[in-house]
Amino acid sequence: VDEKILRSVLIAAVREAHQNRTLNEELKKHKASFNLIQTCKFHFQTLEEAECLAAFAAHCFPDPERVLQGLAELMINAVEHGNLEIGYERKTNLLNDGTWRAEIQRRMLMDEYQDRFVEVVITRKDNGIYAIISDQGLGFNWKRYMTIDPSRAGDNHGRGIAQANAMSFDKLTY
């Protein structure tokens, strides 16, 4: 092994390890900075953006791991069921056919849906942290989804709101 190459590789490895350590320390510092946020507002359109934002926004809450899945479910629902108007039965069929993602992509390009966005506002108040998720859809009968309905237990979806209500948040309202 050429000593010059080995030395170069080792120097690079040490430099990268130091950089990673520094970045991780900064990340920890920034995690604490989320407690300084009073209000923040986000707009997004896609499922990927919903997932990314959920992971980011979860850090605004005292227990990010607890709220992450609930935020993601509600944000994804806002895109697919709200803005893109994919109903429960339609989603069931799309999932059964393996065409759910393709249908999401198709609708995202349609004139009536392409300019729609979801807005998320997170606000810190004395009595808690609030996330308001608003889409531009037609609305739906949310009450039937707040708990897991045994008649839907075998369905391939339809538990996200109930799970968010039961496990992710102290209170979930529409």
Please report, for each region that a protein language model flagged, where it lies by residue.
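Bergerat-fold GHKL ATPase/HATPase_c domain
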Residues: 8-76, 80-110, 121-123
